[in-house]
Amino acid sequence: MSGKLTVITGPMYSGKTTELLSFVEIYKLGKKKVAVFKPKIDSRYHSTMIVSHSGNGVEAHVIERPEEMRKYIEEDTRGVFIDEVQFFSPGLFEVVKDLLDRGIDVFCAGLDLTHKQNPFETTALLLSLADTVIKKKAVCHRCGEYNATLTLKVAGGEEEIDVGGQEKYIAVCRDCYNTLKKRV
């Protein structure tokens, strides 16, 4: 039986990692073998753990290239969990397809759009393959409504790939994005 792909996406501070960690916990409670991965580029909260903004976490294999995942996935692995997929190369798409064909469920979490509202290529590819998409929202940093679907960069230049947290990025709704973008 083929595996299923679940992609959890949305802006920063929307609970993507928290949701990913809840699926890890479900698989562990079901005594299913899991493999958890994060990109080496993201060491914001911990170098060897996936950690949510709220502080919850789980140990993860830290890799640079998607192909490295294969050496950590054993015959009896039932679930693969990948955080911050936007930081991986598009080669992740082929690795995930292979895992699904092997009957392994895959859960991915990551940003769908850059702070300039351009799609992250790897996330977009995974969304095209997904069996289930969980689109998260956040509380808008400006108006306080639970309608933020965008991430606005407020410090640190214009680079689209620039790892950071609250010192660089805020979650905003489209109206507030357009208002604030005129000022930034």
UniProtKB/Swiss-Prot annotation:
Q: Which reaction is catalysed here?
A: thymidine + ATP = dTMP + ADP + H(+)
Keywords assigned by UniProt, alphabetized: ATP-binding, Cytoplasm, DNA synthesis, Kinase, Metal-binding, Nucleotide-binding, Transferase, Zinc
The catalytic residues are E84 (proton acceptor)
Which Gene Ontology BP terms does the record give?
DNA biosynthetic process; thymidine metabolic process
Tell me where on the tree of life, at the top rank, the source sits: Bacteria
Q: Keyword Nucleotide-binding: yes or no?
A: yes
Transferase keyword on record:
yes
Question: GO molecular-function annotation terms?
Answer: ATP binding; thymidine kinase activity; zinc ion binding
Q: Per UniProt, where does ATP bind? A: G10, P11, M12, Y13, S14, G15, K16, T17, D83, E84, V85, Q86
Sites where the protein binds Zn(2+) = C140, C143, C173, C176
User: Where is the protein localized?
Assistant: Cytoplasm
- Name the EC number(s): 2.7.1.21
One Pfam family hit: TK
Q: What is its main location?
A: cytoplasm
How does this polypeptide assemble, per the annotation? Homotetramer.
Write down the HAMAP family for this protein, in alphabetical order.
Thymidine_kinase
- Give the record's family classification: Belongs to the thymidine kinase family.
From the Swiss-Prot or TrEMBL record, give the protein name: Thymidine kinase
